[in-house]
Amino acid sequence: MKKIALFNHQPECSIECCNGIIRALSSQYEVKLFTIQDDLDEVLNDVDGIVFPGGIGDSDSYHDFFTRSKANKIAAFLDRGGRYIGICMGAYWAGSRYFDFLDGIDAVQYIKRPTAEIRRSYGTVADIEWLGQKEKMFFYDGCVFTGSGYYDTIAKYANDEPMAIIQGNLGLIGCHPESEEFWYESPYQ
């Protein structure tokens, strides 16, 4: 069974996001949780991928967690063939203001796009198309991917902009496919 490392730091990385990811992936992957206190070399030593979940993290919390040295260790892990999964906040963190892993594209705030049908950052349900199938997915100030670099679009928002992409060994998702059923109930919307 392949092993993935899942970043967990309350409250910036929601424990609910981590629990949803564990439930979704634990039948196919051994999930190893890690925090900012863990030695990143040890964390990355025996895993196939690293996962950064959603949460309330922003640029301030990112820079509190990840020095350039730690970011370089993750970049070296990717260069060795490791995989990166970023959901919502984790997808933003792959962008130019943070880890800077994307090539020719960036992760930007969806609600600020001129044709976005969602205009506020609070939790709601987004209409998306995932591999050609219409779906509804939990959205909480997620990102969209812009730019001229090459990537494969896995899912799109209602305005046809990319919501989930694969670029090389990065898998990035703006919404929350790991969402639990209760997320769709008040007060989360």
Give the location of each predicted region.
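N-terminal beta1-alpha1 cap of cysteine-dependent amidohydrolase-like domains
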Residues: M1-D46
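Flexible loop residues that form catalytic
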Residues: H9, G55, E178
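Short catalytic/ligand-binding loop motif for oxyanion handling, primarily in non-cytosolic enzymes
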Residues: S14, S59-D60, W93-S96, E161-M163, ...
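Structural motif
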Residues: G49-G55, L170-G174
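Catalytic beta-strand/loop cores that center a nucleophilic Ser/Cys/Thr
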Residues: R119-W183
